[in-house]
Design a protein with these regions (language model features):
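Ribokinase/PfkB-type carbohydrate-kinase core domain
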Residues: 1, 12-190
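Acidic-glycine-rich active-site phosphate/pyrophosphate-binding loop
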Residues: 1-7
Length: 190
C-alpha cells in the first residue's frame, strides 16, 4: 500500500472561475478600447475551445479559429488558497503545428483587413523556428506589426520579431534576448 506519511495537499473547492487567457485576453482588451478585432488562434475540438469561441464572440470579436483535432485547447488551471497560487495544472500541447494547420494560419494572417496585426507568442505550437518567417511574411503591407511575446518561461526569443513596429517584452525576456543581465532597466528599453 501507499505510505500514509507522504506529503499531500488537501483543499476544498469553494468556487470555480473560468475565463479566457493568453491571446484571447489581448483581443478582448483591444476590443474594449473600441477597436474592431479579428481573432485567429489554434484551438482543439473540445469544450475549452467552444468556451473560448463563445466568450470572444460575446465580446464582439470576429473569431476565425483554426481547429486541430489532434491537440487540446490550452487550459491552465490554478489552485488558489487565501490569495496564494498553490498549484498550477496545465493541459497544453507545445508541439509545432502541422504544415496543413500552419498553412491555414498563414492564410488567416494574409487575409487580415485591419490596420494592425498582433502576434501573441506563448510558444504553444504556433510560433517556432519553422513558422515565424512564414507568418511574418503573410502580414499585409501597411499593417502595424506588434509582437506580444510571452516567452519568459518557455524557449523563445523576442528577437524573432526584431523588425516589428512594437514588441512588448518584460524585463526577463529583454535581458535574455540581449544577453544582458547587468544593465539597468532603462538601457534595456533603448
Amino acid at each position: 500500500g501507499a505510505n500514509a506519511k507522504t506529503p499531500t495537499l488537501s483543499v476544498r473547492r469553494a468556487r470555480r472561475e473560468e475565463f479566457v487567457g493568453g491571446a484571447a485576453v489581448v483581443a478582448k482588451h483591444a476590443r474594449a478600447t473600441g477597436a474592431s478585432v479579428q481573432f485567429t488562434s489554434l484551438l482543439g475540438d473540445d469544450a475549452a475551445g467552444k468556451f473560448a469561441l463563445d466568450d470572444l464572440s460575446a465580446a464582439g470579436i470576429d473569431v476565425f479559429p483554426v481547429v486541430d483535432r489532434a491537440r487540446p485547447t490550452t487550459v491552465k488551471e490554478a489552485v488558489v488558497v487565501e490569495g496564494y497560487r498553490l498549484l498550477k495544472i496545465d493541459v497544453v500541447d507545445n508541439r509545432p503545428a502541422s504544415d496543413p494547420i500552419l498553412r491555414r494560419l498563414v492564410e488567416q494572417v494574409a487575409g487580415t483587413d485591419g490596420g494592425a496585426v498582433v502576434f501573441s507568442d506563448f510558444r504553444h505550437g504556433i510560433f517556432h523556428g519553422h513558422s515565424i518567417a512564414r507568418l511574418v511574411a503573410a502580414i499585409p503591407a501597411g499593417c502595424l506589426r506588434v509582437a506580444d511575446s510571452q516567452v519568459a518561461s518557455r524557449w523563445g526569443n523576442i528577437c524573432d520579431f526584431r523588425d516589428f513596429d512594437l514588441i512588448t517584452p518584460n524585463e526577463r525576456e529583454a535581458r535574455f534576448a540581449l544577453g544582458d543581465q547587468d544593465s539597468g532597466v532603462r538601457p534595456l528599453a533603448a
